[in-house]
Design a protein with these regions (language model features):
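C-terminal catalytic domain of Rieske-type non-heme iron oxygenases
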Residues: 1-204
Length: 204
């Protein structure tokens, strides 16, 4: 398995004693599950190719209704992942570090785009790729908002050390977790309730 965490925010339209929560799951060794609005969810798999390259698989799904061709095309365009335009024949993003991700500074100046980038996946890629293939973590200065990053790294290091030193099974191979039921969730909850009580792990 891995771990999960929740973002907890004050609501705008609900009563003052309500909170909006959204959970995110890290599932070892390289999966992320993210909640979305209107029953949408997302799965990302960052599969290592070698020490400096990673293949990203991005899946969008709806828990309540089928996704028809029109909606599928809309989701692909929203993500900035249109084959032949955003993705080349080798599955590489056409907007990349070499061309500054084709950032449109004019659109930013005109107020037409906050980032000047096409698609949410490109925005994420800029953050990831701009660090370079291998980043020197010793120069990082993580803060309290990075607690999930800290926890994930600690978890992975513990798993590696446990495997190398004591022969413990790798993370994800020795837990009785119903993987088919793991999902990220969002909800409006009472401030007197914990998000763990509302979003119970592994329940349908």
């Amino acid at each position: 398995y891995g771990f999960r965490y929740a973002a907890i925010r004050r609501t705008i339209a609900e009563e003052e004693d309500k909170s909006y929560i959204r959970t995110t799951l890290f599932v070892a060794p390289f999966y992320g599950l993210f909640a979305g609005q209107k029953n949408w969810g997302a799965l990302q798999a960052f599969v290592p190719i070698d020490d400096e390259n990673t293949m990203l698989y991005f899946v969008r799904y709806n828990l309540k209704q089928p996704v028809d061709d029109k909606e599928r095309e809309r989701q692909i365009a929203w993500s900035g992942l249109i084959p032949g335009i955003d993705i080349d024949d080798n599955f590489r993003m056409t907007r990349n570090r070499e061309n500054d991700w084709l950032q449109d500074r004019a659109a930013m100046e005109d107020g037409k785009s906050a980032s000047g980038l096409r698609g949410v996946q490109v925005e994420d890629a800029v953050i990831q790729e701009s660090m370079g293939p291998i980043f020197d973590r010793s120069t990082e200065h993580l803060g309290t908002t990075d607690i999930a990053v800290v926890r994930m790294r600690r978890l992975m290091l513990q798993a590696v050390r446990g495997f190398m030193k004591d022969g413990k099974p790798p993370l994800g191979l020795n837990e009785q977790i119903p993987y088919e039921r793991l999902r990220a969730e969002e909800a409006i909850i009472s401030q007197n309730t914990t998000w763990q009580d509302v979003c119970k792990l592994g329940q349908p």
